[in-house]
């Protein structure tokens, strides 16, 4: 498959590890590089993990601890055998002269490696994210070269990652002086209340958009209209009494689960205290 047809999907844990490696870099290091781990399926490169590779860049050469990279990859394979080398990453907002040398190494480790750059300097006010593949150039029998060509890149996340990101966002609006060191998950009922409140605000936003379109205040968007039509068709047809009965049944089940989990927690705490109780 041609590398130009690839699309890169990056998970949040990758960005966190890149930023952590950048913050822990040596004082004389201008950028940090590392290995991207993930999988390739039907033209989609899904990057789910990564690790840093210590290196030094000189004017005419690059020194990288390749044995360290191999050891880290072997250790990761013992934990998750489904993650393979799919490319490499580097901090910064551009491709440097040394990038082609590093890319040659990863081209021996996997087919069509992708190169991901993460702008940790926040020059544009955001963490710029770009993905490239290397296209070989040259004429038969002559000198050959390569050119880094941008390919589409997007952020994606699993459901647990999305839940964790929502918890982290709760500390964004808090001042550093009052920002908590830990964030505990909300109780189930509190999550339902927050989700219902957010759903209500989104419905109000949709209704305002529809009213503005009808009043010719906003130019209609066909794509939005199709999505709204699909949304309406996805709503199950039921009466108000049926919905109330189903909702109450789900709430009762949720309350039962909460009660049982609290009983189990109390039982475990009591058992722990009895275990360490001194005997006469």
UniProtKB/Swiss-Prot annotation:
Biological process (GO), any one = antibacterial innate immune response
List each copy of the MPN domain by range.
8-138
Keyword Protein biosynthesis listed: yes
Tell me the keywords, alphabetical order.
Cytoplasm, Initiation factor, Protein biosynthesis
**InterPro entries per record:** eIF3f, EIF3F/CSN6-like_C, JAMM/MPN+_dom, MPN
Its family remark reads: Belongs to the eIF-3 subunit F family.
Instruction: Name the job this protein performs.
Output: Component of the eukaryotic translation initiation factor 3 (eIF-3) complex, which is involved in protein synthesis of a specialized repertoire of mRNAs and, together with other initiation factors, stimulates binding of mRNA and methionyl-tRNAi to the 40S ribosome. The eIF-3 complex specifically targets and initiates translation of a subset of mRNAs involved in cell proliferation.
Subunit structure, interactors included: Component of the eukaryotic translation initiation factor 3 (eIF-3) complex. The eIF-3 complex interacts with pix.
What name appears for this protein in its UniProt entry? Eukaryotic translation initiation factor 3 subunit F-1
Taxonomic lineage from the root? Eukaryota, Metazoa, Ecdysozoa, Arthropoda, Hexapoda
């Amino acid at each position: 498959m041609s590398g130009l047809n690839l699309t890169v999907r990056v998970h949040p844990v990758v960005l966190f590890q890149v930023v952590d490696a950048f913050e822990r870099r040596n004082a004389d290091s201008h950028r940090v590089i590392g290995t991207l781990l993930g999988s390739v399926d039907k033209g989609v490169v899904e990057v789910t993990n990564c690790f840093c590779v210590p290196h030094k860049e000189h004017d005419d050469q690059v020194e990288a601890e390749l044995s360290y990279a191999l050891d880290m990859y072997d250790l990761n394979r013992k934990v998750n055998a489904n993650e393979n080398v799919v490319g490499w990453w580097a901090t910064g907002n551009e491709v440097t002269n040394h990038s082609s040398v590093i890319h040659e190494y990863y081209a021996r480790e996997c087919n069509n490696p992708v190169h991901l750059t993460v702008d940790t300097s926040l020059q544009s006010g955001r963490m710029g994210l770009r993905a490239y593949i290397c296209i070989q150039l040259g004429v038969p029998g002559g000198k050959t070269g390569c050119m880094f060509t941008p390919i589409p890149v997007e952020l994606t996340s699993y459901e647990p990652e999305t839940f964790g990101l929502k918890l982290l966002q709760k500390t964004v609006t808090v001042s550093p002086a009052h920002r908590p060191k830990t964030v505990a998950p909300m109780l189930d009922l509190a999550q339902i209340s927050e989700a219902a409140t957010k759903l209500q605000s989104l419905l109000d936003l949709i209704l305002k958009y529809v009213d503005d379109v009808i009043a010719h205040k906003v130019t209609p968007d066909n794509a939005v209209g199709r999505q709204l039509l699909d949304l309406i068709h996805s709503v199950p047809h039921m009466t108000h009494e049926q919905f109330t009965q189903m909702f109450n049944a789900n709430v009762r089940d949720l309350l039962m689960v909460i009660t049982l989990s609290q009983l189990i927690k109390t039982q475990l705490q009591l058992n722990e205290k009895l275990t360490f109780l001194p005997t006469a």
